[in-house]
Amino acid sequence: MKVRASVKSICKDCKVIRRNGSVRVICKNPRHKQRQG
C-alpha cells in the first residue's frame, strides 16, 4: 500500500474508487495499491 498525495492508475487494471471519503486505487497487482493521505 503506497500512501501518496496524488493517486494515479498505473496500469489498465487499476481502478480509482472513493471509500469512506478517501481515494484509493485497487488493482490485481498488489504493488499498485494506493491511497491518498
Curated annotation (Swiss-Prot):
Record-linked InterPro entries: Ribosomal_bL36 (IPR000473), Ribosomal_bL36_sp (IPR035977)
Domain of life of the source: Bacteria
Biological processes annotated in GO: translation
Assigned keywords, A-Z: Ribonucleoprotein, Ribosomal protein
Taxonomic source organism: Magnetococcus marinus (strain ATCC BAA-1437 / JCM 17883 / MC-1)
Keyword Ribosomal protein: yes
GO MF annotation terms: structural constituent of ribosome
Name this polypeptide is given: Large ribosomal subunit protein bL36
Family: Belongs to the bacterial ribosomal protein bL36 family.
Record-linked PANTHER family: 50S RIBOSOMAL PROTEIN L36, CHLOROPLASTIC (PTHR42888), LARGE RIBOSOMAL SUBUNIT PROTEIN BL36C (PTHR42888:SF1)
Gene Ontology cellular-component annotations: cytoplasm; ribonucleoprotein complex; ribosome
